Amino acid sequence: MSILRPSKEAILDDLRSFVLNEAEERTGFLATAVSKLNVVRRVQQGQKLSFNEPYLALILQGKKKTYIADKSFTYTAGDIVVTNLSLSSRTVVQEASFEKPFLSIVLTLDPLILSEVARRYGFDASEQADAPAMAVSQANSDFLLAFARMSRLLQEEQRGLPFDKFYYEELMLRLLASDLGRWACDLISPDSRVSKITKAVEILKKDFKESIRVGRLAEASNLSLSSFNRQFKTLTGTTPLQYQKQLRLYEADRLLRFEKRSVSQTAFNVGYSSLAQFSGDYKKFFGVLPSQVCPHAS
């Protein structure tokens, strides 16, 4: 006796309804009541700069193109996207409208849980991608159904029960078993290039306001200075000091937009000693002067 399975399009339709119900009229990157589970709804086309932690995303509707250094990645409905490193990227929403918004589900990747799932089910974490820190692939029906089960935690109000951990681990298992599994292994293998560079990234994220020697980052990554610089740029598209500057500017943007800090206060809070240098860097990165973002901040 055969058991009827829903079609991929039917599963995607259910997940679109879930995201629309969860987002209501809100737009942007939206956290849900389930840990690590987020939804995205965008109604306008255009470019956006963003800084993202490692994630697994399922695209439900619309089209995006992401640029990391000299590489680009295009994804649309039914695609799975994975990143295994904290990255700054330029993303262009190519298809989105109020009537038909861009929709996706985004899971934050937890290296500890991913590593435990890999160990429990015997995945060889030493199999590495040796490729950019982002990858795109088509989701199969099993992957889509795993996302559907995770989404029902909100629909059926099962929050707080062990189901959230169970369904999250199932998605990590699906990821490891997919053709994107090598990117996931890069995140958890201690000998992978991603894991080594991640040690430097963690220092940069923690001490981005301070002056940091590149030699210190290379030592933390257990790489020679030349190898470290080469591998860092291959993965992130920037030099370590450019990466640090981006961290400062993203934090400055947050302080200006959401905490309404003054430009001078913001500049010094993120590690700049020169207000003119800060204003110049901010405009070059975001396209506007910081004084235009929050002109009335005290």
What are the residue ranges of the model-derived segments?
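N-terminal positioning helix adjacent to the helix-turn-helix/winged-helix DNA-binding module
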Residues: 139-142, 167, 192-200, 236, ...
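Structured core of small recognition/catalytic domains
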Residues: 157-160, 165-167, 173, 182-196, ...
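Alpha-helical structural elements of signaling/regulatory helical domains
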Residues: 142, 156-159, 209, 258-262
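Amphipathic alpha-helical segments enriched in hydrophobic/aromatic residues interleaved with Lys/Arg
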Residues: 2-9, 116-170, 174, 202
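Basic/polar phosphate-binding segments, predominantly the helix-turn-helix DNA-binding elements
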Residues: 174-180, 189, 205-207, 211-250, ...
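A short, N-terminal "cap"/entry segment at the start of jelly-roll beta-barrel domains
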Residues: 1-33, 128
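N-terminal regulatory/effector-sensing and dimerization cores
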Residues: 26-126
